Swiss-Prot record:
Name of this chain's protein: Nickel import ATP-binding protein NikD
UniProt keyword list: ATP-binding, Cell inner membrane, Cell membrane, Ion transport, Membrane, Nickel, Nickel transport, Nucleotide-binding, Translocase, Transport
One term of GO molecular function: ATP binding
Family: Belongs to the ABC transporter superfamily. Nickel importer (TC 3.A.1.5.3) family.
Taxon lineage: Bacteria, Pseudomonadati, Pseudomonadota, Gammaproteobacteria, Pseudomonadales
Purpose of the protein: Part of the ABC transporter complex NikABCDE involved in nickel import. Responsible for energy coupling to the transport system.
Enzyme Commission (EC) number: 7.2.2.11
Pfam families given in the database record: ABC_tran
Cited Gene3D superfamilies: P-loop containing nucleotide triphosphate hydrolases
Principal EC category: translocase
Length: 256
């Protein structure tokens, strides 16, 4: 039976200068999108990286328990087996001297898939994310593909890895409006079809409105509000959520 709920409880991230993330609780459910929203510098990306134990040098996760369907698990078992990560800057996710086929082969090898079966699996996953020209994409290097195509390639690698959960850190911020819309459409399709559980980090309330089932609002390293998306938009409980919603409404009114 596949896992259905991944939780982090009491996540704390510190430097020598002090605490940056304070006792964060998050819950991801299969088939749902949980958005972690807040202003720049609020601790969203750090929380995402802390969950995967991928913090940069000088930062440490000093507290926090991971649970899968209520059972404790080690952080080392989360990456690759349970979760995949989509980064804000897609080019930084790929080795620039290796083509896409090399990245795909490495991912599939971790699943014990090789030879002709691997090639068929690559083609299937690339087609699922809208990268139809399979051979051209697989022979391409990161500098030869657009940002939108690289984001899709990261999703394809997640499908190859067959992880039940996906963490996406500001995945649309470097994309143009059309590529952003296509990426979000793809993400929602994969949630519905494959039952992915997604943690989507964003500062864009438009993205939240479009995708979110649950919303966690972050300010100064703390979760200040967490509730279903439709309730947050109707009755925001925190000043931070009200400020974000007001800014979103002003921006929408200013657009032609």
């Amino acid at each position: 039976m596949s896992p259905s709920v991944l939780e982090i409880r009491g996540l704390r991230i510190e430097t020598q200068a002090g605490v940056l993330v304070h006792d964060v609780d998050l819950q991801l459910r299969r088939g749902e999108v949980c958005t972690l929203v807040g202003a720049s510098g609020s601790g969203k990306s750090l929380s995402c990286l802390g969950l995967l134990d991928l913090l940069p040098p000088g930062l440490a996760r000093t507290q926090g328990q991971l649970l899968l369907d209520g059972q404790p698990l080690a952080a080392s078992s989360v990456r690759g087996r349970l979760t995949s990560l989509v980064l804000q800057n897609p080019r930084s996710a790929f080795n620039p001297v290796r083509n896409m086929a090399s990245h795909a082969i490495e991912t599939l090898r971790q699943r014990g898939i090789t030879s002709a079966v691997a090639r068929a699996r690559m083609a299937h996953c690339l087609d699922a994310v809208g990268l139809a020209d399979t051979e051209r994409v697989l022979q391409s290097f990161a500098f030869q593909l657009s940002g939108g195509m690289l984001q899709r390639m990261m999703i394809a690698l997640a499908l190859m890895a067959e992880t039940p959960f996906l963490l996406a850190d500001e995945p649309t911020s470097d994309l143009d409006a059309l590529s952003q819309a296509r990426f979000l459409d793809l993400l929602m399709e994969l949630v519905q079809v494959h039952g992915l559980g997604v943690l989507l980090v964003t500062h864009d309330m438009g993205v939240v409105a479009r995708c979110a089932d649950q919303v966690a609002v972050m300010e100064a390293g703390r979760i200040v509000e967490c509730q279903p998306a439709h309730e947050l938009f109707q009755r925001p409980a925190s000043a931070t959520a009200r400020t974000l919603l007001h800014a979103h409404q002003v921006l929408c009114r200013s657009q032609p």
